[in-house]
């Protein structure tokens, strides 16, 4: 029986790298995958995942209006060799899209591997993450570390000088130049780096 997996972590833990490796593993065995990326993440263009270590892969762009179950059903009808669905930046999914992913596992018997962060720079949950945490069959934490050596669980937004930003829009695209993964203590203290 297929399952809905949610791989979650703070930023910069290697979620996209893990996703691309999973897709590669299927492809190496002669099985096709569908890889989706919400359009809101256009740092590398709408249809490409790019990792910090230089790996990249093509994706299918998702908008908030994409009927995910229909899209996957149609692709499966065209190519019955599709064996897995993968979603990067899954925190940007809508509730109905997470429902659709659950339906894909239940009705189409395809495993779904979703990768994302749980919370934003204010410690508030993303819509997609809320429902993945509630409905996924398996929750898998991908660990990364804070500058102090503790497990990083939070995402601290920083300005050009490295100062913490506590207010603003929930979504502001950026990587290492705009966000740093911290433990809860250093998130609360607003310390993106080790103080002397």
UniProtKB/Swiss-Prot annotation:
Annotated EC: 2.7.1.21
Binding site for Zn(2+): 146, 148, 183, 186
Active-site residues annotated for this sequence: 89
Catalytic activity as recorded in UniProt: thymidine + ATP = dTMP + ADP + H(+)
Transmembrane feature ranges: none
Coiled coil, from the record: none
Subunit structure: Homotetramer.
Family note: Belongs to the thymidine kinase family.
Protein name: Thymidine kinase
Organism: Coxiella burnetii (strain RSA 493 / Nine Mile phase I)
